[in-house]
Regions:
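Hydrophobic beta-strand scaffold residues
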Residues: 9-11, 120, 196
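Flexible glycine/serine/alanine-rich "lid" or loop that lines and gates the nucleotide-sugar donor pocket
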Residues: 6, 173-174, 191
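Catalytic binding pocket for nucleotide-activated donors in carbohydrate/polymer assembly enzymes
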Residues: 28-30, 50-52, 177, 184-266
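Active-site and donor-binding regions of nucleotide-sugar-utilizing enzymes
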Residues: 1-68, 96-99, 128-129, 167, ...
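Conserved catalytic-core segment of nucleotide-activated headgroup transferases in glycan assembly
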Residues: 63-158, 232, 264-267, 271
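C-terminal alpha-helical cap of glycosyltransferases
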Residues: 268-288
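Acidic donor-binding loop of glycosyltransferase active sites
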Residues: 157-164, 169-183
Length: 288
């Protein structure tokens, strides 16, 4: 972007995630900015002084394929990856080490979920560490570790494959509950109208600075305010919410719809087309 600016070449940039403008600094102001939703549009204006006419809201392009829905029937998919089609499915997206001074949560949650009479899939992040040292994987639980590894010697040197994303699509479509921390998994769950239980409890008493920090950030506050997710602050509350959601998945449907409306802007599967239209317009091909 710096080289382009010096060379007089127009710059079209895109904000890729909801936290990019508040937890990071936009060091170069592009000529045009593509964003997912009006929340990020307002951040670009209020925090960086960008004029509204230079910002285009398109929705979330990555979700376009999700509106197609699953291509493999539930029973076939479950059997293919080793799940019991007779039981419900819970997906756990780990907190990850970087969200805490010391990750004491992920192991505790996995051990708690292992006692459920349900299928449990732990969907690890492709490029972040999750400390569960010494944990023996429960026999009825699947550890899904997505990502193509480019270099085993360099942690995080990996990327999701189309097959990884296709598997996630099917897991989300067929699951009955999503358990997660303050991550984009919250939007994933809402998009598929799946109950979302947020983990915010700990095995020992911790100071606030040692807890999961992102619950207090600006980008996650709309999720908490939506009414579309429940935040468990004790193990008893966590277990109670688990069983409540598995029994009544319709709970908090309106709040999840609000998350989709605010975060996805247009849930119509055409976000990628809007990105292409913006790029063509920048090239002077309006209406192409």
């Amino acid at each position: 972007m710096q080289d382009a600016r010096r060379a007089g070449i127009a710059i079209v940039a895109m904000v890729r995630s909801s936290d990019n403008l508040t937890t990071r600094a936009l060091r170069i102001i592009p000529d045009r900015l593509i964003v997912h939703n009006e929340i990020i549009q307002n951040e670009a204006s209020s925090l960086y002084g960008m004029k509204a006419e230079r910002i285009t809201v398109v929705g979330i392009p990555h979700y376009d394929k999700y509106f197609r829905g699953p291509t493999v029937p539930r029973e076939s998919f479950f059997r293919k990856i080793g799940l019991d089609p007779r039981k419900k499915l819970v997906i756990y997206f780990p907190i990850c080490d970087y969200r805490m001074r010391e990750n004491v949560v992920d192991r505790m949650v996995i051990e708690t979920l292992a006692n459920l009479d349900a299928n449990v899939v732990v969907r690890f992040p492709p490029a972040e560490s999750v400390t569960i040292a010494g944990l023996v994987k429960p026999p009825a639980m699947i550890f899904d570790r997505p990502g193509y590894v480019f270099d085993e010697r360099i942690y995080g040197n990996r990327e999701l494959t189309p097959e990884d994303d296709e598997r996630l699509l099917h897991l989300l479509a067929y699951c009955d509950l999503v358990v997660a921390g303050p991550s984009t998994a919250a939007i994933d769950a809402a998009l598929f109208d799946k109950p979302l239980l947020l983990v915010d409890f700990y095995p020992t008493t911790l100071a606030e600075a040692e807890k999961i920090y992102e619950y207090g950030t600006e980008h996650f506050s709309p999720i908490l305010a939506s009414g579309g997710a429940r935040r468990a602050k004790s193990r008893d509350e966590f277990l109670s919410r688990l069983h409540e959601y598995l029994t009544h998945p319709e709970l908090d449907h309106a709040g999840r719809a609000r998350i989709v409306e605010e975060q996805c802007w247009r849930a119509d599967g055409r976000s990628s087309q809007r990105v292409v239209a913006e790029l063509l317009a920048a090239l002077g091909h309006e209406g192409a």
